[in-house]
């Protein structure tokens, strides 16, 4: 289904591009030269915005948050990272191949020292549009406490352990006793 949808998108993009190219009378321009009213062609926009590795300036502190005693020069580095659009809100642009790159960075310890050292950073070499991970499933990996009467239970998100909202003392105050299996206050057994 996704392949068919992508194929339709590309076919439509190609038709629009060819139709526009047929009627445009654009003169060739030198590299770096821009027309005042230049219009970027649809296919160029589409290809440049689709999910792919793209050079991104990344703050070194984002990659090394524990190295707060240093000032880095430069403070950010150019890295290839996945970015772009996937043409479907259910998909996200994610890396499928990565590698490390080592760069020389000046590390400055204020009022003490400075030196050029090597630091390793992660780069993305391949990207794909893949289904977004279900955030609700990631946030709560625990199964439900009970299929019925869920409102009677409370669940510890760390251990997934279920316990009763009712307490034994609350049940006893009503001359009842807590049934720990159902989490209800029942009449005492005789």
Curated annotation (Swiss-Prot):
GO annotations of cellular component type: extracellular space; membrane
Keywords recorded for this protein, A-Z: Angiogenesis, Developmental protein, Differentiation, Disulfide bond, Glycoprotein, Growth factor, Mitogen, Secreted, Signal
Family membership: Belongs to the PDGF/VEGF growth factor family.
Subunit and partners: Homodimer; disulfide-linked. Also found as heterodimer with PGF. Interacts with NRP1. Interacts with isoform 2 of BSG. Interacts with CD82; this interaction inhibits VEGFA-mediated signaling pathway.
GO molecular function: chemoattractant activity; growth factor activity; heparin binding; vascular endothelial growth factor receptor binding
One GO biological process term: vascular endothelial growth factor receptor signaling pathway
SUPFAM superfamilies: Cystine-knot cytokines (SSF57501), Heparin-binding domain from vascular endothelial growth factor (SSF57593)
Species for this entry: Equus caballus
Disulfide bonds, paired cysteine numbers: 51-93, 82-127, 86-129
Protein location: Secreted
Highest taxon listed in the record's lineage: Eukaryota
Record-linked InterPro entries: Cystine-knot_cytokine (IPR029034), PD_growth_factor_CS (IPR023581), PDGF/VEGF_dom (IPR000072), PDGF/VEGF_growth_factor (IPR050507), VEGF_C (IPR027928), VEGF_C_sf (IPR036841)
Glycosylation sites: 100
Keyword Transit peptide: no
Signal peptide (residue range): 1-26
Protein name: Vascular endothelial growth factor A
Pfam families assigned to the protein according to its UniProt record, in alphabetical order: PDGF, VEGF_C
SMART domains: PDGF (SM00141)
Function in brief: Growth factor active in angiogenesis, vasculogenesis and endothelial cell growth. Induces endothelial cell proliferation, promotes cell migration, inhibits apoptosis and induces permeabilization of blood vessels. Binds to the FLT1/VEGFR1 and KDR/VEGFR2 receptors, heparan sulfate and heparin. Binding to NRP1 receptor initiates a signaling pathway needed for motor neuron axon guidance and cell body migration, including for the caudal migration of facial motor neurons from rhombomere 4 to rhombomere 6 during embryonic development. Also binds the DEAR/FBXW7-AS1 receptor.
Main localization (coarse): secreted
PROSITE patterns (UniProt xref): PDGF_1, PDGF_2
């Amino acid at each position: 289904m996704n392949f068919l949808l992508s194929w339709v998108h590309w076919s439509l993009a190609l038709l629009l591009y060819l139709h526009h190219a047929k009627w445009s009378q654009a003169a060739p321009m030198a590299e770096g030269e821009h027309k005042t009213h230049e219009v970027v062609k649809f296919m160029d926009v589409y290809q440049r915005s689709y999910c792919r590795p793209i050079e991104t300036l990344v703050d070194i502190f984002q990659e090394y948050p524990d190295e707060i005693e240093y000032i880095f020069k430069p403070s950010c580095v150019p890295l290839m990272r996945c970015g772009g659009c996937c043409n479907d809100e259910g998909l996200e642009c994610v890396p499928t191949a990565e590698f490390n790159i080592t760069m020389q960075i000046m590390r400055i310890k204020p009022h003490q020292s400075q030196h050029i050292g090597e630091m390793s950073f992660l780069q993305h070499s391949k990207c794909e549009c893949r289904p977004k991970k279900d955030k609700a499933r990631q946030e709560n990996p625990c199964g439900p406490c009970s299929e019925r009467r869920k409102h009677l239970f409370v669940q510890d998100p760390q251990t997934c352990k279920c316990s009763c909202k009712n307490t034994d003392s609350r049940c006893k105050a009503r001359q009842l006793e807590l049934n720990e299996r159902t989490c209800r206050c029942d009449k005492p057994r005789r």
